[in-house]
Amino acid sequence: MTDIIPENVNNSKITIICSAPDLASQNIKNHLLNLTEWKNLELPPESRFSAARESIDGKFRLVDIEEIHVFQDGLDRKLEAAGLPASLIIFASKHRSKEEINSLTVHCTGNPSGEARLGGHPKELAVSSPAAMKSILSGMKKLAGEKELKYDVTLEVTHHGPTELSVPSIYAEIGSTEKQWEDPDAGEVAAKSILAVSLEKVPVAVGFGGGHYAMRQTGLLLETKISFGHNFPKYQLEFVDEALVRQAVEKSGAEFAYFDRKSMKSEDRKKISEILEKLGLRVLKESEIRENYGLDD
């Protein structure tokens, strides 16, 4: 790679953020560097970024940070100030779980409750990119299957930070232990899926119910034409109010809602249904989504 000062720094790009202390992030980064050609970008002296590169095709930037991802509130402004404006931010990251499940995941960020222990602000949601989440998760599913990887490919619910971002952002992750974070096959699958990302418009839903791994929403995302923006699991529905639902709709472009009904308490269904009715958003059942938005044969 040669050092090149970008000729048009005002041109927004899909920007992949890789964190130095994150093993999965470094794994994905190494594959990104090998899968396509990049040119180094000169950073201003005041920039806190470690390095920045742009793909030769001009579609992506790859930016290195020394901190962890979740506390990167205001990152879009920092990128802009460094002459690296982003149209979409993809955080290449590790996923950790107590169950230590082999996993490839995507999700958007936000703090539905009044707490923000892992970055972001309480009761604030980030702008999501349902199209990017659908594209990357579908790519992960396809490529992991071709490699016969024993990984769960799943959509996670909205959680942690950063939330203070004015451009869309998503996480693309490898989980859930050091063994998987450094797995070269998983790193390759994640990197290829990111580089193949499509931002083609898709029908968007906001999801309610289910667990942290939104299994029913994952099935609908992978098996129909729709995608999801924000998803709220059953254990956080008590925090859902009109302001939060309004945020979820406005920051994802949601056109309708989906309930994982059996997982939801009746009082939560009633409360959220009334909010959605007030906002003019209909609730579609799984059967209706599959009928109206089924994949073409």
From Swiss-Prot:
Secretion signal span: none
Record-annotated disulphide pairs: none
Cofactor: binding comment: Binds 2 Zn(2+) ions per subunit.
Pfam hit, one: tRNA_deacylase
UniProt keyword annotations, A-Z: Hydrolase, Metal-binding, Zinc
SUPFAM superfamilies from the UniProt entry: AF0625-like
GO biological process, one term: D-amino acid catabolic process
Hydrolase listed as a keyword: yes
NCBIfam families: PRK03995.1-5 (NF003073)
Summary of subunit composition and partner proteins: Monomer.
Family to which this protein belongs: Belongs to the DtdA deacylase family.
Protein's UniProt name: D-aminoacyl-tRNA deacylase
Record organism: Methanosarcina mazei (strain ATCC BAA-159 / DSM 3647 / Goe1 / Go1 / JCM 11833 / OCM 88)
Name of the gene encoding the protein in the UniProt record: dtdA
